[in-house]
Amino acid sequence: GRTKIVWVETPANPTCAVTDLAATAAVAHAAGARVVADSTLSTPVLCRPIEHGADLVMHSATKQLNGHADVLAGALVTARRDELWERVTHDRGYRGAVLGPFEAWLLLRGMRTLFLRVPRSSASAQRIAEWLTTHPAVSEVLYPGLPSHPGHAVAERQMSGGFGMMLSFRVEGGGDAAKRVAAGLRLFKNATSLGGVESLVEHRAPVEGPGTGVPDDLLRLSVGIEVVEDLLADLEQALPCGSDASRGGSHETDA
């Protein structure tokens, strides 16, 4: 067939859409195509796509693998050391896409705590997602750990130990209201990256650009390793409450 690669990202950024890896692999392999899975948001701690039929797995090691926001790196994993692996490593060497020794050391340092950081941030993200579903200023919460998420059953099958550190939610009142919430957060820092020890927030629509389908009222959270009660308190003081929620007003607190 004409299709050579089927590319999936699961969970997807920033919508948290979940792709059934096993079903995708069955269809792709029947057509003679390979499956490449971007598993950045899961890390190998929560999901190992090769075990579900993927041929290659990609990670932005800049994100949670490193976890300290001080490295630019990536990883490509093959199912076995075969002809495909040889082609990938040959191309990597000739194009010079080789990580520097200091960056490699930083990445190894960060990965020593991976199995501590990922479960903590995932558990905190789950609590935050559940809390946001009850808030009057939030119209929708996107997180595969919620039973209401359309991909929850698939995520349960192919993920273990949690559903990841990233979630998104939509704010009542539109894009301006979402911007006010992001600006009002104190512990969550406004930044584009994700997967570090610090919790981040981003108004995502301007980053994604027009035509991508990302709504203007969507905020993306990357949950770090802070005390989750502090993160919940930060969200509570930034989100409008009561009648203010429908008007997109601010939630003012005493200084």
Where are these regions (language model features)?
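Conserved PLP-enzyme active-site core in the AAT-like
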Residues: 1-137, 142
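Conserved C-terminal alpha-helix-loop-beta "cap" of PLP-dependent enzymes
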Residues: 137-219, 223
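N-proximal accessory regions
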Residues: 103-126, 131, 162-163, 170-173, ...
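Residue-level signal for secondary-structure boundary sites
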Residues: 82, 175-177, 229-231
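PLP-dependent enzyme catalytic core of the Aspartate aminotransferase-like
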Residues: 117, 183, 199-255
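Anionic group-transfer/hydrolysis microenvironments
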Residues: 11, 40, 61, 170, ...
